[in-house]
Amino acid sequence: EDTGSEATNNTEVSLPKPPVIENGYVEHMIRYQCKPFYKLHTEGDGVYTLNSEKHWTNKAVGEKLPECEAVCGKPKNPVDQVQRIMGGSVDAKGSFPWQAKMVSHHNLTSGATLINEQWLLTTAKNLFLGHKDDAKANDIAPTLKLYVGKNQLVEVEKVVLHPDYSKVDIGLIKLKQKVPIDERVMPICLPSKDYAEVGRIGYVSGWGRNSNFNFTELLKYVMLPVADQDKCVQHYEGSTVPEKKSPKSPVGVQPILNEHTFCAGMSKFQEDTCYGDAGSAFAVHDQDEDTWYAAGILSFDKSCTVAEYGVYVKVPSVLAWVQETIAGN
């Protein structure tokens, strides 16, 4: 078997001739493997045999070649589960390699979340920052600056807004090129099940703002529990009964709360700092699979201790739309 590190690029490599055995014959086989941070995607097993027509074929898929796709949700240095973070901690180890930084054309920073080698999720509100309400996706895309990993600038090809973005605060960003995956840049997995049950702990990362409302240059993260939805609705809307609702948001901005959202909040003893950026993932660790999933995307940030809850769009609510959009673009 030739398991050479780099697949031989149409250049003949002289291998020693295998010894002949009595009543036997030699069959030429190769096995495809992927570089670190990528995994083999194929219905076969990656092993190909040279047939009589001198074509490499696999038992299950014939001549169709496998692909190497990015591994998701497996950070090399996952955040320390034991640490209880209330004030927000600096991410020195690259525990959130899916976190991207988005800068609008008038220099407002927000977050975005890498979900494969070429696509990111963010909020529709982020995409409209500094644009008129009737701006088109084609006008927005060229105005964005996007950074992944250690401040690596990546070029945006297009923006796709959720068809119902006034209710579902979500948009997708496609990059011009696939971004190479390594320990600093890795997508988070998208969940097919709902991880947002009350009390579940998730991690939110972002550049946030310090108490002077200045953006910080260091990625920070905070650990938060999923909150009771009714309490959150009462906090922002005064009542869970539609007729009795009156917007009473303590911060003057009304978050979008509906069946596509969940809330997460902290104890009241938080420091005078805002964490997380809209567009960042509510990342949960599935311990059975040892995999990190984006349960939600931060839509409305708690505004520095005044409001108790952050509001997130449920990723399973938009999963079908995300998959269709990526497949069609």
UniProtKB/Swiss-Prot annotation:
Official protein name in the record: Haptoglobin
Main localization (coarse): secreted
Pfam families, per database record: Trypsin
Summary of the function given for this chain in its UniProt record: As a result of hemolysis, hemoglobin is found to accumulate in the kidney and is secreted in the urine. Haptoglobin captures, and combines with free plasma hemoglobin to allow hepatic recycling of heme iron and to prevent kidney damage. Haptoglobin also acts as an antioxidant, has antibacterial activity and plays a role in modulating many aspects of the acute phase response. Hemoglobin/haptoglobin complexes are rapidly cleared by the macrophage CD163 scavenger receptor expressed on the surface of liver Kupfer cells through an endocytic lysosomal degradation pathway.
A single MF term (Gene Ontology): hemoglobin binding
Highest taxon of the lineage: Eukaryota
Annotated disulfide bonds: 34-68, 72-189, 232-263, 274-304
Organism: Canis lupus familiaris (Dog)
Keyword Aminoacyl-tRNA synthetase: no
Domain (Sushi): residue spans on this chain: 13-70
Phylogenetic lineage: Eukaryota, Metazoa, Chordata, Craniata, Vertebrata
Region named Interaction with CD163: 241-246
InterPro entries: Haptoglobin, Peptidase_S1_PA, Peptidase_S1_PA_chymotrypsin, Peptidase_S1A, Sushi/SCR/CCP_sf, Sushi_SCR_CCP_dom, Trypsin_dom
Domain Peptidase S1, residue spans: 85-327
Keyword tags: Acute phase, Antibiotic, Antimicrobial, Antioxidant, Disulfide bond, Glycoprotein, Hemoglobin-binding, Immunity, Secreted, Serine protease homolog, Sushi
Subunit composition and interactions: Tetramer of two alpha and two beta chains; disulfide-linked. The hemoglobin/haptoglobin complex is composed of a haptoglobin dimer bound to two hemoglobin alpha-beta dimers. Interacts with CD163. Interacts with ERGIC3.
Entry-linked CDD domains: CCP (cd00033), Tryp_SPc (cd00190)
Known tissue expression: Expressed by the liver and secreted in plasma.
UniProt key word ATP-binding: no
Glycosylated sites: 9, 107, 214
Subcellular localization, as worded in the UniProt entry: Secreted, Extracellular space
Propeptide boundaries: 84
GO cellular component, one term: extracellular space
Domain writeup: The beta chain mediates most of the interactions with both subunits of hemoglobin, while the alpha chain forms the homodimeric interface.
Family: Belongs to the peptidase S1 family.
Example GO biological process: acute-phase response
